[in-house]
């Protein structure tokens, strides 16, 4: 057994108690501090064992434990379609799964124009131990505030600041691979439809598309690029321009845009892939089950959320945070590009 840090009949440590009872250290800490979401039965069992073994918490450790909330703040984009997005739904599931396994709770806050006020309130009132930011932006008030307040956080997305803990899918290579496949299949004129330019992933996907075009000898300037396509009422005008230019394939940066594109084409009697091919840089169940099913990139956003949460908990518990392993992806060719 390890070094004794407390006095008692057997010199039990917090880790020893957790091991004896088959729970983790966070659960024992919650029982001692009286904070956190524990059942009355679990709390009573832990406190009874502590009384029997004569455990007395170290004063410094107890003081630190009182400051812990075992709450993780999760910053979600404040947009109407956020829960329609397969990425955010699956990522949220992964975060909550790992948080629950370690006896942490998740408090969700929306990343909107009031984000500084909302996040500052959580920080100032000591409601959270750390934060997971669910998107990386070119200009991010969330990251700026977290750096200023020195609250531990993990960013899901890319960052040029090597001091920031972050993890992301390999969007650059994946988008390049899918675009290469389209070009290898004979596509020469494409329209790329993307979302908010303030999101870093938009620029990464554009770069992957551009690199595939250039290395294949296609003139990137001849491809149609439409960014900031964030509303349903924009789709019709963009697709009208694309069809007028003789575009052979419409490439959508995410599943939300792609669902809107497929619905518009279907409503207007434009057959896929006979009149125009369609592909997406992000897959979802809706695209897989569409008629026809859509060629897409499949990422494991659930695993991304799991790994981000493990990184944050390791940081909060003083463990070494290792370089994260990037989850794999798949290029899935379906009927929409045949």
List each model region and its residues.
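Hydrophobic alpha-helical segments within soluble ligand-binding/sensing domains
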Residues: 167-192, 210, 214, 231-241, ...
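Short, solvent-exposed amphipathic alpha-helices that sit
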Residues: 86-101, 174-178, 200-219, 260, ...
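An alpha-beta-alpha
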Residues: 178-218, 323-338
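N-terminal helix-turn-helix DNA-binding module of bacterial transcription factors
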Residues: 1-70, 338
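Alpha-helical recognition/docking segments in bacterial nutrient-uptake
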Residues: 1-9, 71-180, 238-245
């Amino acid at each position: 057994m390890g070094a004794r840090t407390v006095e008692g009949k057997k010199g039990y440590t917090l880790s020893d108690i957790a091991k004896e009872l088959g729970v983790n250290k966070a659960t024992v800490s919650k029982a001692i501090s009286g904070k956190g979401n524990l059942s009355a039965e679990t709390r009573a069992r832990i406190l009874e064992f502590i009384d029997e073994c004569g455990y007395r918490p170290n004063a410094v450790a107890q003081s630190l434990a009182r400051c812990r909330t075992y709450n993780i703040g999760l910053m979600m984009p404040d947009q109407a379609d956020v829960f329609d997005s397969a990425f955010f739904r699956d990522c949220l599931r992964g975060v909550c799964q790992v948080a629950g396994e370690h006896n942490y709770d998740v408090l969700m806050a929306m990343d909107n124009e009031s984000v500084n006020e909302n996040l500052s309130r959580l920080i100032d009132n000591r409601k959270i131990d750390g934060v997971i930011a669910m998107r990386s932006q070119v200009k991010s008030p969330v990251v700026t505030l977290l750096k200023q307040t020195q609250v531990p956080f993990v960013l899901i997305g890319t960052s040029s600041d090597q001091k920031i803990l972050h993890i992301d899918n390999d969007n650059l290579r994946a988008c390049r691979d899918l675009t290469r496949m389209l070009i290898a299949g004979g596509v020469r004129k494409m329209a790329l439809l993307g979302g908010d330019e303030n999101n870093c992933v938009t620029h990464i996907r554009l770069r992957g598309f551009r690199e595939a075009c250039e290395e294949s000898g296609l003139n990137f300037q001849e491809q149609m690029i439409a960014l900031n396509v964030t509303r349903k009422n924009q789709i019709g005008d963009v697709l009208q321009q694309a069809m007028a230019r003789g575009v052979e394939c419409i490439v959508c940066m995410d599943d939300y845009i792609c669902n809107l594109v497929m619905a518009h084409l279907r409503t207007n009697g434009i057959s896929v892939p006979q009149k125009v091919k369609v592909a997406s840089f992000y897959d979802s169940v809706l695209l897989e089950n569409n008629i026809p099913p859509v060629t897409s990139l499949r990422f494991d956003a659930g695993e991304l959320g799991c790994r981000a949460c493990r990184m944050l908990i390791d940081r909060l518990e003083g463990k070494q945070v290792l370089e994260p392993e990037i989850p794999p992806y798949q290029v899935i060719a379906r009927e929409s590009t045949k």
